[in-house]
Amino acid sequence: MTPSSITTYYVVDAFTSVPFAGNAAGVMVCGGGETGDTCLGPLARPDDPATLPIMQQVAAEVNLSETAFTWKAAGSAEYAIRYFTPTVEIALCGHATLAAAKVLWGRGAVPSSEAIVFRTGVGGQELRCALEGGRIKMVFPDDQLDAVEGEEKAELLSAFGWSGDVRVLGAYKGRLNQDYLLAVPEEVFSRLDRCLNMQKIQEVNEKYGVRGVIVTARAGGREVADGGVAVDIKSRFFCPNAGIPEDPVTGSSFPTLAAFYKMSKFVGLQDHPRRKGVVRVERLEESGQTAISGDAIIVSRNEWLV
């Protein structure tokens, strides 16, 4: 890019109704120009190989857990989307998709009465976002779980410093995103920070081709978050192999949580120590899908000059 091709990018706090909570995502709208700004040259097309190192450099400079890049496709509300952490491109990111939808509606690129269809750059998955009841709703395919056993399970538990004296309620791997899910009692969940070993978690994830590890416990509606919302389950998500030791709110992990808990509806709190977020989940059994919804706030608008 050159100084003559100034591009606006945004920072959005996703899965929260208050600023400086939830998960912050960068959003860069490329090749659209609905409000007069443009993203030409090497970022004009999502399928141009020259875009990859540039997008990676931008994501590293923005230095949020994920940055989303979007391009207007055929149809008034269809967009290509790609996601980058500061170190690597990833196939899917729920909170960055939520953030991108918030930006496109907010800047008038798509009327708020219309749904937005995103097509991911890796894997070609289609994600539909719509405004319902003031929140952004996304629909994912249902996940399916496989039990993790034997040596793989032992290595995974060891990465958290757990041995036979810690009661683990279940160890699974989701097929949708290749995430581990560890279900534990609430008292074990509350002590997670005492036993984390990010180097070992990264080694296990890389050895077995896993994106990240979900650790979850029931909350039973006793906890309240984000302005008085009663919470049913809690979770945390660890993905050091993607350059993110712990992701604050991981929307794409909730279909995996839904497959484990098997509740028709629930409210999940992703309980990051510094940035908590709330995700509402509904299983759409007739269509074999899982819907997640949440709030989002645009906290800054910036100009990319180089």
Roles of regions detected by a PLM:
Residues 2-92, 98-306:
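Active-site proximal loop and beta-alpha junction motif in alpha/beta enzyme cores
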